């Protein structure tokens, strides 16, 4: 159980407060010796400090992105090349990778299959055995609202 009595503070001798106690004097010597022996410049610590030194070296080798000036090269316009562009930017006439020649582009569009959105849904009436279809009940294409305004495609 805990008692509620007041405890007397420990009495320390005057020589201990003055650090004249022989048991504590060696601590000052150890701390001085430790400071002399430790040289942080000789051995870098492993971990973050080593990476930081490597980053400093790599920063010196190549400039940061914000330090490099942006080179403005005018956009490619097919068939338009002047002597000024060729001399100033050392540009050679070439076709961009992402864009095709317009003539080839049109033929590719014709050969592509239509998207699912563009194809009409075929409506087949339910099959009933022994029943013949009337002329009005032939299979027909259901045309979406967008297509009703324009061309109607039936398959």
UniProtKB/Swiss-Prot annotation:
<dbReference type="GO" id="GO:0007417">
    <property type="term" value="P:central nervous system development"/>
</dbReference>
<feature type="region of interest" description="Disordered">
    <location>
        <begin position="41"/>
        <end position="73"/>
    </location>
</feature>
<dbReference type="GO" id="GO:0004865">
    <property type="term" value="F:protein serine/threonine phosphatase inhibitor activity"/>
</dbReference>
<dbReference type="GO" id="GO:0010921">
    <property type="term" value="P:regulation of phosphatase activity"/>
</dbReference>
<feature type="modified residue" description="Phosphothreonine; by PKG/PRKG1">
    <location>
        <position position="119"/>
    </location>
</feature>
<keyword id="KW-0597">Phosphoprotein</keyword>
<comment type="function">
    <text>Inhibits phosphatase activities of protein phosphatase 1 (PP1) and protein phosphatase 2A (PP2A) complexes.</text>
</comment>
<feature type="compositionally biased region" description="Basic and acidic residues">
    <location>
        <begin position="58"/>
        <end position="69"/>
    </location>
</feature>
<keyword id="KW-0650">Protein phosphatase inhibitor</keyword>
<dbReference type="GO" id="GO:0035556">
    <property type="term" value="P:intracellular signal transduction"/>
</dbReference>
<feature type="modified residue" description="Phosphothreonine; by PKG/PRKG1">
    <location>
        <position position="68"/>
    </location>
</feature>
<dbReference type="InterPro" id="IPR033242">
    <property type="entry name" value="PPP1R17"/>
</dbReference>
<protein>
    <recommendedName>
        <fullName>Protein phosphatase 1 regulatory subunit 17</fullName>
    </recommendedName>
</protein>
């Amino acid at each position: 159980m805990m008692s509620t009595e007041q405890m007397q503070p420990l009495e320390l001798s005057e020589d201990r407060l003055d650090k004249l106690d022989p048991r504590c004097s060696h601590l000052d010597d150890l701390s001085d010796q430790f400071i002399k022996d430790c040289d942080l410049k000789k051995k870098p610590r492993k971990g973050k400090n080593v990476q930081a030194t490597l980053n400093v070296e790599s920063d010196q080798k190549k400039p940061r992105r914000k330090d490099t000036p942006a080179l403005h090269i005018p956009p490619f316009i097919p068939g338009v090349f002047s002597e000024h562009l060729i001399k100033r930017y050392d540009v050679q006439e070439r076709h961009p990778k992402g864009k095709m020649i317009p003539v080839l582009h049109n033929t590719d569009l014709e050969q592509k299959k239509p998207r699912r959105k563009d194809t009409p849904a075929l409506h087949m009436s339910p099959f009933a055995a022994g029943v013949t279809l009337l002329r009005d009940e032939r299979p027909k294409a259901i045309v979406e609202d967008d297509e009703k305004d324009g061309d109607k495609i039936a398959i």
